Amino acid sequence: MIDSSRRAAAKAARRGRPNALFLVAAAETLPSELSGIAGGVTVNFPWGSLLRGVLAQDMPILEGLGRLLGPNGRLEAMVSAVARDGLTLPGDSDLRAGYLAAGLDLSEYRQANAQEIAERPTSWARRLGAGRDRPVWRIVAVARAERQHPEGS
């Protein structure tokens, strides 16, 4: 198991960008040292609690993602949720209000086009049938410059 982890890390290191940080942690409990360090956060086809957070239906998660961003940093998400997922897509005003409460200005919330979906060729998107069997929504938000990152959050 350790050997396969080393091989996976080596492959990622060869492909990764030198300024990329990879972390396995819950979005709502990210270390405070990460507050404000990111110019951008990308979330591709989340499910479960991360999907609820991106849809502003689990605010601690959305707030955690927002805390990662420096002033004017961008959160970009591609999401797909249908009734059988047990989630309802929020209306524009509800999503906007949730993002504002998390210190983010919602700049885009619309159905993604085929090219945007193709630019995110994840295995999970293929399994979902994203864009083919299920609609995909693009969400883009920008961190408000006047936000403060409280100590320990």
Which residues does each predicted region cover?
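Class I SAM-dependent methyltransferase SAM/SAH-binding core
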Residues: 1-30
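Short, well-ordered coil/turn elements that cap or connect secondary structure elements
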Residues: 15-17, 70, 101
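A short acidic, Gly/Pro-enriched loop at the edge of an enzyme's catalytic core
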Residues: 24-45
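Short "lid" loop at the C-terminus of a central beta-strand within the Rossmann-like core
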Residues: 29, 47-48, 80-85
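A short SAM/SAH-binding and catalytic strip from SAM-dependent methyltransferases
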Residues: 38-58
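A short glycine-rich, Lys/Arg-flanked "PGG" loop and its adjoining helix->strand segment in the class I
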Residues: 55-74
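Acidic carboxylate diad motif detector
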Residues: 73, 77-81
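Class I S-adenosyl-L-methionine
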Residues: 85-153
